[in-house]
Amino acid sequence: MFKQLSTLFSGLVVSICCQAQQTFPQNGAYDERPGRYAFTNATIVVDPKTTIENGTLLIENGLISQVGKQVKLPAGTVVVDLKGKYIYPSLIDLDSDYGMPEAKRDRPAGGRQTPQLESNKKGAFGWNQAIQSENDASLIFTPDAKKAADLRKIGFGTVLVHSHDGIVRGNGALVTLTDEAANKALLNRKASAHFSFSKGISSQTYPSSTMGVVALLRQNYYDAEWYARTPKAKEANLSLDAFNQIKTLPSFFETGDKYSVLRADKVGDEFGVQYIIKGGGDEYQRINEIKATKATLILPLQFPEAYDVTDPWDADVISMAQLKHWELAPGNASLVARAQIPFAFTSAGMKNKADFWKSIKTAVEYGLPKEKALEALTTLPASLIKAEGQIGSLKPGLLANFIITSGDLFDKDNIIYENWVQGKKFILAPINAPDIRGTYLLTINNQPGGKLEIAGSPEKPEYKVIVQDSVKITPKAILSNELLTLSYQADKKVTGTTRLTGWLTGTTLSGEGILPNGAAVPWNATLTQKFQQTAAADTTTIKPKETGPILYPFVGFGNEQLPKSETLLIKNATVWTNEKEGILQNADVIVQNGKITKVGKSLAAPSGAKTVDGTGKHLTSGIIDEHSHIALFTINEGGQTSSAEVRMSDVVNPDDVNIYRQLAGGVTASHLLHGSANSIGGQSAMIKLKWGASQSEMVLPDVKTIKFALGENVKQSNWGDVARVRFPQTRMGVEQVYFDHFLRAKEYAKSWKSFNSTSKKVAANAPRRDIELDALAEILDNQRSITCHSYVQSEINMLMHVADSLKFKINTFTHILEGYKLADGMAKRGIGGSTFADWWAYKMEVKEAIPYNAALMYHQGVTVAINSDDAEMARRLNQEAAKTVEYGGVPEEEAWKMVTLNPAKLLHVDNRMGSIKAGKDADLVLWNAHPLSIYARPEFTMVEGAVYFDRKKDEEKQKSMQQEREKLIQKMLNDKAEGKPTQKPQAAQPKMWHCEDIVGVHTEHEGHR
């Protein structure tokens, strides 16, 4: 007796102590019960690697107390016999907007908004509204009963929530899906930090591009570091304060496609941050590069629906990338797992959360191991946010967050009966539903009423009423415990509904009904045949899904295998060397290890070399396009008058089909320029056209150039009436932009030089790192070259005089259609001209352009290049070079140099490309005719010894592409015939960028546009 009283007293003390820890009063008596439940005779999946057969799970006060085969149950425990059912940890979603307010952008009256250069956010926050480090999800979290119920229904118990707005989004909060107050749901108010490439609802003009987003984020990291080490900073900045507090938390980066994953990781590498990256579902397309990031991924589960290709004209607009992604996307997780890349799943982005398990099971069908799928939903997400001591498995001391299922979680017909969150039960389906399935003889008011067929599952029966032997009616039905309610219209000719309510007794349903005329009558249904369960498919014999190959790049004309450098002997060709040897007849060239090793006659083939007969053909170095905008996701950052901080290398698009098309025209390298939206543009990128290679393999990192611009674009002449805010608005103002920025860059460089020269460096005294001024300081130090968009003589003279006075060098004037007027001044200063062959009169700025421009500059000693600035023109740059022979009598060899050696000189890469010489890169083109002829076509184009375009193989590729398209179209037609959902075809035309093009970043580019 004394022992019982002691135990009771101890329980009261614990209960009272628990109450004492609560700060919220309760209206009424406190419920002192401990919520002690034991779930026995269950298959308990403790974690993906541990399963207990016929085990017991004991929970108490919202926590797991014990788990195992032999569990001693305390007195007063409520025992639930699960009779072999399964228990799993509740699921975790790391990318949720549950309970978060919707971010809404203010719309200006009349739909026209004056450019907003500065932040309009009130308070001592940072200068850019897209940086929202101060956002604290825990302060704006409000439980949403409906959304919580929807998530619990598919098995989730905990979610990581954050505000999905902005580039830096602040900190996330870990919350449970209880139906109680936020105070109960909140597990960790500062669980994570969140980032994206979308500026969200910010109405500021900057950034206006993805590369601008990257630059802003990089600068924010540098500013936060400076702010933290500089106690005497001249400003208070709550955004930087908050950023320094959250940057040590697990950092999540939301992206939209495979290249954004790589871009995010590149930012993280610069600052020693390993982001956890939410992908776009196309990671399989660049799996090796993504694995090299060592990032953990968050994978979406919204797979593309088949396109409705019934109409062949509709089918024609679908790209190969769209077709292939539809086929391969469900296997993304399987391929990620096979590559040993850790990942978690998210339900974010799903059109219908009810399709969650359908997508998971589809991923399993495509080869994803069940253990990996469970890990991606439980233990791994818990470990990523350092919450494995609270959630993610069924171990003592963790929250009692678990689900009870009918069987294996990944089985086709599995049912989730209950979801327990913090020890509280939420019923999703009746756990011991009576099995009333079968065929019944229906009698209403002692008269035959047809048949009642009940199929489906015990938990979710499916009903059919059969009248007049053949007419099947689907009634409205509600089964609660053993009480059944049916309502249906028995005869369409008679208005009204028959309503039946009854209960199960043995094998008979009986009760009372109401006829359409209002009469109350008895009814019953007698079981005549038990439901015959269809045998489940043997999953061990299911064949893996057959899919086509992954292409590199993942578009039409992509390669199944990337070309490799070959050892070649090209014999008896007419070789245009671009060297002092000139044009060699019947000459040989040897290529080894990506380099030209020998040039001469009657050369012996190296061991293992493939011999190419060049008889009657011309061999040249590859064409170099000095001014190009291909292979980019965006080209202008026009949010400010200077965007020297942005880098075109951050937005290189290796999937652009123009790479392949230009290889077909003999182009092997392109200089990718920022557009002409502002006076000081972004840092350019030079790429080799290695079709199918990664971004890093294409970009030449040692080529450091930058785009400047003059003229009407930079002063926003054609941007509309509202664009009257950004400086400069006149050509006079453009001059002051250059003076202002370079004078500040001089002072900036001077301050760093002074700091670096001190013997004892104190971090607090270091200047603030400014990546915009870094680029300009490199120009002053001759470490970065300027290519300047230019048309009018007066402005060109202005910039040359500014450069003279500030002691920096202009490398190249591009366009330069009035270059013939000042070629002597350009030659004197060593400035090159990269121009069009014969474009003129297409706008007022070029009204005095002439087709003899290139020749006149050449004759004055200017290094002249012919460029494209156009994806289509670049396919025929050999013909553009030929025009200089027509207009001005430029010698043929010199004309050819204008698209090969001269652009190499202007880009300072003539030591490795631009001519055929031993030791240079084997970037070669074999033409079927004189390269300046309009009839000339490349037989093959190689880059560093690898053939990336071969005309014969191209013909074969076109045939195989057509066969692959038709195969995929037939698969889509089969999907539609089987009743699966389809979507309307959407044309996916690649963007053809030009200097003036602007694209916003309120939403990031998608991978399959």
What is each stretch, according to the model?
Residues 410, 508-554:
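Edge beta-strand at a domain terminus
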Residues 42, 399-432, 573, 921-961:
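C-terminal cap of metal-dependent C-N hydrolases
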Residues 143-282, 415, 421, 503-507, ...:
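Polyanionic/metal-chelating signatures
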Residues 22-24, 29-35, 44, 48-90, ...:
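Histidine-rich, glycine-flanked metal-binding segment
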Residues 33, 103-104, 111-126, 134, ...:
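His/Asp/Glu-enriched, well-ordered alpha-helical/loop segment
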